[in-house]
Amino acid sequence: MKAESSSMAEWHASEGLRQRYALDEAKQGDASRKESVQDELTDTKDDPAAEAMGGSPSMVLGRTPDGRLFHVIDTPDMVTSIFRLDRPKAPLDILTLVLLLWQVCLFCVLPRKQAQVFFAVYFAFWRIMYNVGLGYVLTKQSRSRWIVRMLDSSGWLDACKNPRMHAWVQYHFKTKLGASSQRIAAAPIDFQAWILFRSVVDVILLNDVTAYAFFALSNIQGLGEHGVLLFVIRWLLGLLLLAFNAWVKLDAHRVVKDYAWYWGDCFFLCLQKLKFDGVYEVAPDPMYSIGYIGYYGLSLLTGSYAVLYVSLAAHASQLLFLVLFENPHMDRVYGERVPIAARVSERRPSDVPPATGVQRSREEIRTPQLAGAASAANGSYATSERGTAAVPSPPCTNVHDLHHRLFRNDNVVLSHIDLFRSSDFLLVLCLIYALSPLVLTRCGPRALLLFATIHAVAWRLFHSFGLGFALRWQSEERWIVHHFLKHYHFADGQAAVTESFSHWKTIYNTSLIMTYVSFALLAIRSYTSWTDNIYRLRYVLGVLLILVHMWSARSSYRVLGPFGWLYGDFFIDAYPKRLSYTGIYRFLNNPERSMGSAAFFGMALLSGSLTATVVAQLAHLSHWWFLGCVEGPHMRRLYGADVRQDSGVTKQLRQLCQSQWLRAAQPSIEELQGILQRAQGVVRQLLEQSRPRLERLADDTCALLQQKAEHVLTMHTGDSVQQIDQAKYRVTPVASPHTHEQRFHVGEPIIVQWMAAENHSRRDWIGLYAVNALDAHPDEHHGSLLVTRTTSRGKWLGVAEDEWEGHVHVGLTQSPLGTHGVSSVDTDTHQVSGVSVFQGSRLPWAAPGTYELRYHHDNTHYVLAKSERFTIYADSPEDPYSFDETFMILSKILRYALVEAPSTTSAAAHEYESADKADLTLWTQDQAQHIRDGIWSAFHVDFTKDVVIASANTTLLTRDILMARQLLSR
């Protein structure tokens, strides 16, 4: 249901079914806000509209979604209208009584076993009718007045359209309301629809509770095996719970009356002063929590586990009704609009320097800390590395900044897991190892050996290839740093580099340790008793290989230090880097190539296992790949000619190769080297080509899934389609007021003028298509008509936009055609014209390019008209490191993305007004997504919505863009 701004100003409530209790007068805003209503609601005593309507002060006013005020007619309660014999019965009341009497007769006639099965099924039917049926219908009514529009379209309330049903409805009103029915004709259709709806609710509710009661009675047990004392206690508690449940229901109805009991706020708003006491002071959501405690009272009385299980299921379904329908409905009708991000700065006048240059901030101009030499918050001056325009310092810290500095998508239980963060990586690792004993304790020796083998191989593959590819992409395109820049907000660029390197160090060290530990466990698990004659030699060689490996690793660390050992030169540019051929590197260029796997072969010799030997060979080959394809290219890229070609050992071997007895083998060796180099090149090329193909495959898969969710192609044949006069159809984008041509900036609303035959389908729609997508999926011809064979990816509008709910055409509102703008009818040419506006989520924010509009027939993909192709573009700065240019382009994107939603009240917007003009208030996730996509289109910097929300300031976002471009420009 669409609530008007005036209604929102008078009403503030939140989640709950048929209960509305008071908000705190100080408006301290409890986050739960369930089943609450403002204490000081507008009463007719103080409402001038009531006096203008000439009503009595005691009468209650109602307001329809379109703003119409009316006097709410008193209605009889359910017990009075249905069960009092002296009251006339409406047709639906008679149906209710017949169904209830039928249940009584069946309970008396059916054998006990059959009664148990029947009433279990019968209760499930009515419970589904309640939770699923009413939930679905009420959701549609809450969102789009579906019930009201159905009654209006069917003519049940119009004597001219449907006289028979109109007479039946009037008879129902007269019987149900008695003398008050004389005023029903003056009541709005929303109120009349509610009166009919509550009669249907009575049928469902009474049959639901009666079926449950008979199901419980059919399962009642006697004393059983527990004795008289427990039986008496069980019955006393059960009766007490039933009595308490009855009080909850009666007291709740006393407070909220029939209006909230029958979800009247789905139809209209009732303006009256309510005092929420009694049961509403006992528990939250009383109609959902303690309001169903009678289920457990009957379970105690019957002593049946079947009744208990059915009661739990029924109560759970009612809670789902609360979560899926009632809470969203209350948010729509009563919920205060709260932004997802609001950066509100408060400053003293003395803190505000004179405005200079572009009016983007009230702070003095400073130079950005893009080089990362000093913190952006220390207020010092520095010169930009690129010599660009001066950049204002970030605004002062406020609650928004403090929150996003302390909490950055931190992992809570298992939410927001990011395996690039070492803490999350270790958490997942701990969970896996904590759960593994559940499997291992039931495994035999062979299974344990298999597990140890898989365990060792998995760690080796992860260490060499998983971390290897990550390091390779980090070297080529700063992949790891880009991940942190994309997902987290940083005060300066060096903070992003430092944090990414910090997490890398922990993950790499953990992986390195686990690689050796997992292989050692495999060697122990696969150990076999030595029975050959050379076991002493194997023992000595194995220990020597392990000691050689330890000496080699220790010697390498002494030369490399922690920076080189942990591959710091892949991350940190400012750290002094130089090649030092001392220590073990005096003799070997890369000791790991020859001795990096010695420990694995040593442990394999000690175990005497073929399995361990094979895994050791795999480890050695994997590490060779890492050194050749990851570390080697990076060293050549970073140090160039400083990389030594020949080590001391290599020089001596080369001299040995000059001897005559080895010259004969030289051609074969050179040929083998050439083959290995070519094979390495082929593997490297394959890896480079596979990555973009996998990315395209993922994009195509996402596009296909989205296409399935859109319009299904409906292939009509016959004269009804072929005889359409396409000359009467036209669709044209109106030129942009900024460029004065059909050329639109990303995010700029596109006004579309369309023309159609007067008798065209109300299900016609207009799609916005990228030309490259149309070229990739050529159109299909069906007679004289084109059929679009690609998806609009959600970029479409119905010509009668208000008649659509998602992708489903409701087709009930007979309003003038057109959505935004005025439609007109040309009686001479028998054509109708209108205006539609593509804006917000209907625009391609992340994909500027050449586009085309297509007018489609009757909810199909038949093309009746096409527009001329036009351009959607995004400005880009001439100097990619200019603050002023970036700021101006970003401001344009923000202006389009932050167009205030229709439901945003001026009072809510004023509450989050900031002293800093650069501060942003984001109301929806869509706005953050549009800003993110616009930044990608204009600057080719990839952020997530979380970064946009964390910044919430034009100056900070500009800094983030410049920082990311500089860090990733390498």
Swiss-Prot record:
Its EC number is 2.1.1.17. The chain crosses the membrane at residues 90-110, 117-137, 200-220, 228-248, 282-302, 305-325, 425-445, 447-467, 504-524, 534-553, 595-615. It is an enzyme of class 2 (transferase). Residues 111-116, 221-227, 303-304, 446, 525-533, 616-970 are cytoplasmic. Residues 24-59 are annotated as: Disordered. InterPro entries: Phopholipid_MeTrfase (IPR007318), Phosphatid-EA_MeTrfase_fun (IPR016219). GO terms for molecular function: phosphatidylethanolamine N-methyltransferase activity. Pathway: Phospholipid metabolism; phosphatidylcholine biosynthesis. PROSITE patterns: SAM_CHO2 (PS51598). It is a multi-pass membrane protein. Belongs to the class VI-like SAM-binding methyltransferase superfamily. CHO2 family. This is Phosphatidylethanolamine N-methyltransferase. It comes from Malassezia globosa (strain ATCC MYA-4612 / CBS 7966) (Dandruff-associated fungus). The lineage of its organism: Eukaryota, Fungi, Dikarya, Basidiomycota, Ustilaginomycotina.
